[in-house]
Every structure is written in C-alpha cells, then in structure tokens.
C-alpha cells in the first residue's frame, strides 16, 4: 500500500510520526492531511531519506535546484552544490541537469545527500532524442515513459511532470500570446513536440499509465507548470489558468488512485496578484500542497533576483504557499555557482520564516521573540545561535570588532540597549 492508502485506512505510519514530532503536531493531524491530499511525505523504497512533510499546517519548506547545463558539465561541482544546499538548510533538492550522463550524474547527487530529491524526467527524454535523432521533436512516447521509470528506480522522490499541457492549453497560449515568451524548458519541449507531431501530450493522454509507474516506485507527482509566466506582465493569463485547471483535475485523479501529489505554481507574479494565485490554486486543487517557483515580483533586477524572490516568497507563504523553490543571484544570467546556491537557500529560508510568522504566528514567532530578548540583553552568543546563519553573523561582527565587547561598531559606546540597561529596566 502507498502512504496515501495507509492514511485513508486510518494507519499512522512511522513517517507520519516523524513529521508530527518535527512539526510539533499530533500524528493524527498528519494522517488526516495525507488522506485528504493536503500533506505529502516524500519517501523511497530505494534509499533512506531525511523525512520531511510538505503541505497545509506544516512549516513552509524550501527546495534548492541544481544541475549541469549543456555548456558546463562539472559533476563534482554539482555534488558540492548538493552537499552545500543541505548544509545551508534546504529541505529538498531538485537535480535538473540538461547535459552529460543523466542517470550517472543524478545517482552521484542522490548518493551524496540525505534530502529528498526531485527531477524532471522529460528533460532526459527530449535531450537524449536530440542527441540521437537531431531534434527534440523526434522523441518517442516510449522514450518519455522509459526515462521516467529509470529515474524513479534511482531513488528519485518526487518528479515534476508536465501533465497540464494539452491541446486546449496550447491553443490558449497561441491565441493569447506572451510578452515574455515561454520560460519553462519543459513547456517549450512539450509544446514544440505536440505541434510538430500534431499529437496530444503523452503525459496527459496516458495519465493512468504514468500514475502506475509513480505508484510502483513511490514517487510523489508534482504537476509541472509549463505555462507559467516568464514576465510579470504575463502573470495569471489564460494559458496559465488553463494549465492550473488541468493540473488540478489530474491531481485529484492521482490522489484518488493512491498517489501523493503536489501542484506547482507560477514563477513571475506581481505582488498584487500573489494572493489571487495562491487562493485560486488552493481552491481549484482541493488544497493540495502548493509549490511556487520563486515567485519573482519584478523583472528588472538580474543579479539580485534572490532578493526579488524573497519578497514574493514571503508574501506567497503568508497566503498559504507550502513549498518554495529558491532563486539564486545567478537567475536569468548564468548557471549558479556554489556561493549562489548557498545564498539562494538562506534567502529563501528567511522568506519561508517570514511567511510562517503570518501563517502560524503561535509557532513561528517564538524564534523572533527569543532573538529580541537576546538583543536586549546584549547576549551575543545567544544571538549567534539564533541567527539563521550563525557563522556569517559571527564573522561580520568579528570583522569589525568593537572596543566595547558588549556592543558593536555601529554604536560603540553609545549603544542604546546598553545605555537603557545601565539606567533602568525594560525587561518584559
């Protein structure tokens, strides 16, 4: 039985107990959430992973994405990035390579970390078709499903599968047009294949077969968003919403068949449309776990898109987004390096916490309360321990060490907190 089938029968599994303990919740709450399709716990019969729950009522989680490109195939660097992402506090990792030996590279990455690992199988199928036949449009349907199964057997825990691109979705995209084009690689691959071959998307047309593969290998389905906007002026357009409708329908169908499902959301969304996107997705999908790629709230800040994303992600999480994909400073510019990955993870972790302060104030705000008290008391060791990046906080202060060890060089002898502590009591 799958974990969904266990949950529907009233069985509380060991994974549910682990998530409940980690979140400070009752195991029965986790069981009910999985049974209803509102919570997922990625696992695998092929490898032991760090158990992590995603969904309503749980802390907002952060995914880090890595992977070689056709220009840069440095396997050791990708392994280092995976290890660094886990150390920096990522909850999951997606290996999205588009070059080299697909299965060999993914195996090395999977073996290097304990996190749940996700993938996009159609990348492998389409790119291997381009190598073999000279063009992505000559991929066969069997090659697509074979790539999916091969990646599942490696121990991949969740997969972004572009089920929401069908002929209706594609018609809406072409009729409406886009200011920023189509930014999803998976969407570009699949739509080009469909138009050239004049055929329906195999992942949509053969959805029951896809579910069989994923169930057999206990892979969580993440409904890919190939029609997401690549520019804020295209956000929440007809093609995006059409894909959301289809993805919500297939998500419901998959869950009924015992599969865990995540629904993916858009990547470029202006601030005033975030609440609409989150609420629309939650209602349409029956409150499935919602995974947003970013989102980026402006398009004018290449080199600083991790900051742009932090703004959007914190608002998204506050409205109910459950799962955030990080964005690095290299977004739209280059393949991220090691430092970009670390920065992306930490920035998104901050955003996730900010969102949780609104979503779950009784749980999330204690961390900030403890930091406020430590600052009042000028307890630097406590402040370091509470910082989201203790090593960085300590290093910054030590790089400009104060004469007065109670204070910092911003205020020196005229530290407001120290002056008040010496003259009257404000403790609360």
UniProtKB/Swiss-Prot annotation:
InterPro entries: ThiC (IPR037509), ThiC/Bza_core_dom (IPR038521), ThiC/BzaA/B (IPR002817). Pfam families: ThiC_Rad_SAM. Pathway: Cofactor biosynthesis; thiamine diphosphate biosynthesis. The keyword 4Fe-4S applies. Substrate binds at residues 94, 123, 162, 184-186, 225-228, 264, 291. Keywords: 4Fe-4S, Iron, Iron-sulfur, Lyase, Metal-binding, S-adenosyl-L-methionine, Thiamine biosynthesis, Zinc. Its cofactor is [4Fe-4S] cluster. Zn(2+) binds at residues 268, 332. Gene3D superfamilies: 6.10.250.620, Radical SAM ThiC family, central domain. Disulfide bonds: none annotated. It catalyses: 5-amino-1-(5-phospho-beta-D-ribosyl)imidazole + S-adenosyl-L-methionine = 4-amino-2-methyl-5-(phosphooxymethyl)pyrimidine + CO + 5'-deoxyadenosine + formate + L-methionine + 3 H(+). It comes from the Archaea. GO terms for molecular function: 4 iron, 4 sulfur cluster binding; carbon-carbon lyase activity; zinc ion binding. Binds 1 [4Fe-4S] cluster per subunit. The cluster is coordinated with 3 cysteines and an exchangeable S-adenosyl-L-methionine. GO terms for biological process: thiamine biosynthetic process; thiamine diphosphate biosynthetic process. Its EC number is 4.1.99.17. [4Fe-4S] cluster binds at residues 408, 411, 415. Catalyzes the synthesis of the hydroxymethylpyrimidine phosphate (HMP-P) moiety of thiamine from aminoimidazole ribotide (AIR) in a radical S-adenosyl-L-methionine (SAM)-dependent reaction. Belongs to the ThiC family. This is Phosphomethylpyrimidine synthase 2. The gene is thiC2.
């Amino acid at each position: 039985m799958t974990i969904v089938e266990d949950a529907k029968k009233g069985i509380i599994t060991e994974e549910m107990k682990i998530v409940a303990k980690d979140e400070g919740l009752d195991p029965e709450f986790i069981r009910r959430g999985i049974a209803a399709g509102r919570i997922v716990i990625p696992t695998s019969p092929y490898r032991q992973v760090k158990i992590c729950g995603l969904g309503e009522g749980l802390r907002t989680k952060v995914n880090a994405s890595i992977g070689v490109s056709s220009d840069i195939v440095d396997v050791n660097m990708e392994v280092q990035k995976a290890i660094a992402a886990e150390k920096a506090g990522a909850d999951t990792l997606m290996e999205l390579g588009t070059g080299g030996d697909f299965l060999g590279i993914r195996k090395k990455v999977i073996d290097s970390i304990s996190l749940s690992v996700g993938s996009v199988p159609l990348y492998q199928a389409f790119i291997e078709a381009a190598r073999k036949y000279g063009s992505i449009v000559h991929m066969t349907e069997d090659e697509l499903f074979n790539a999916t199964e091969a990646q599942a057997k490696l121990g991949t825990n969740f997969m972004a599968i572009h089920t929401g691109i069908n002929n209706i979705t594609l018609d809406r995209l072409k009729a409406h047009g886009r200011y920023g084009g189509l930014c999803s690689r998976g969407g570009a691959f699949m739509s080009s294949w469909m138009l050239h071959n004049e055929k329906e998307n195999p992942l949509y047309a053969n959805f029951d077969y896809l579910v069989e593969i994923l169930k057999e290998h206990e892979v969580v389905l993440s409904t890919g968003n190939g029609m997401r906007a690549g520019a804020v002026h295209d956000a929440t357009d007809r093609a995006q919403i059409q894909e959301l409708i289809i993805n919500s329908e297939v998500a419901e169908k998959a869950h009924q068949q015992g599969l865990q499902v995540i629904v993916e959301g858009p990547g470029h969304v202006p601030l005033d449309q975030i609440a609409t996107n989150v609420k629309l997705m939650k209602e349409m999908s029956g409150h499935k776990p919602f995974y947003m790629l970013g989102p980026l709230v402006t398009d004018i800040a290449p080199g600083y898109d991790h900051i742009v994303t932090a703004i959007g992600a914190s608002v998204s999480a506050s409205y109910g987004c459950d799962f955030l994909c990080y964005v690095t400073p290299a977004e739209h510019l280059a393949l991220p390096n090691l430092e970009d990955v670390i920065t992306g993870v930490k920035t998104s972790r901050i955003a996730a916490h900010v969102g949780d302060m609104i979503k779950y104030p009784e749980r999330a705000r204690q961390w900030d309360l403890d930091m406020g008290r430590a600052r009042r008391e000028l307890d630097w060791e406590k402040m370091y321990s509470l910082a989201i990046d203790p090593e960085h906080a300590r290093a910054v202060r030590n790089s400009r060490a104060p004469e007065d060890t109670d204070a910092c060089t911003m205020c020196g002898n005229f530290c407001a907190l120290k002056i008040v502590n010496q003259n009257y009591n404000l403790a609360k």
